[in-house]
A protein has these predicted regions:
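A generic membrane alpha-helix/interface feature
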Residues: 37, 86, 176-177
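P-loop NTPase nucleotide-binding core
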Residues: 41-44, 48-155, 160-163, 169
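Well-ordered alpha-helical segments embedded in enzymatic catalytic cores
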Residues: 21-25, 137-141, 175
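Substrate-engagement module of ASCE P-loop NTPases
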Residues: 143-146, 175-180
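Substrate-gripping "pore-loop 1 plus following alpha2 helix"
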Residues: 168-176
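A short, basic N-terminal segment
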Residues: 1-36, 41
Length: 180
């Protein structure tokens, strides 16, 4: 008999079992704009739970952004991925992505790179100027887009402990707390 369970990666659909109470509570928190932190040992299904709930609440009026911080090797890379994902999830077409980046990231000279599937595969880079408000502008991006478009945005940061490996993790965390 084959094992019906999947281990070691996020699951969805029929592989996601139980956790109804957790999902219900997280759904309520995210729908009502309540900052929520999930803490448990590794491999207990936090990522699967967040992805399930954010897929359920994602709509025309409430957009969800999922960022795997584990893939970020530096503070700069976090900002780049953060900006890319926020723009991607809050805009539906290439020209809208570009327009959104131009409007909301105008002070940092955004540059787009498109992959083989330009509708889904693109990344954003920018000129980094430590003397301006680049970090602040990027971290405020969801709030500014939400206000302009009349929507709400939920941002999920998975594997947040990865910031401990950034150059100056305490300063980075202080920036996040100050702006968010």
């Amino acid at each position: 008999m084959n094992n019906p369970f999947i281990f070691g990666k996020a699951v969805e659909g029929s592989y996601f079992t139980d956790r109804q109470e957790d999902a219900k509570r997280l759904h309520a928190n995210l729908s009502h704009g309540i900052n929520t932190i999930l803490i448990s040992p590794r491999r207990w299904g936090k990522t699967s739970l967040v992805k399930k709930v954010t897929a359920e609440i994602d709509s025309k009026d409430l957009k969800t952004v999922f960022i795997d911080v584990f893939s970020c090797k530096s503070e700069y890379e976090f900002y780049r991925i953060f900006a890319t994902e926020v723009v991607k999830q809050t805009s539906s077409k290439i020209d809208e992505w570009i327009e959104t980046a131009k409007i909301f990231l105008s002070n940092i000279s955004p540059k787009f790179s498109f992959g083989s599937d330009p509708m889904n595969d693109f990344s954003l880079s920018f000129e980094w100027n430590e003397h301006d408000d680049t970090e602040k502008e990027i971290l405020q991006l969801p709030e500014k887009i939400a206000e302009k478009k009349g929507i709400r945005i939920v941002v999920s940061l998975d594997e947040f402990q990865q910031v401990a490996f950034f150059g100056d993790q305490l300063t980075f965390q202080k920036k996040l707390r100050t702006i968010w």
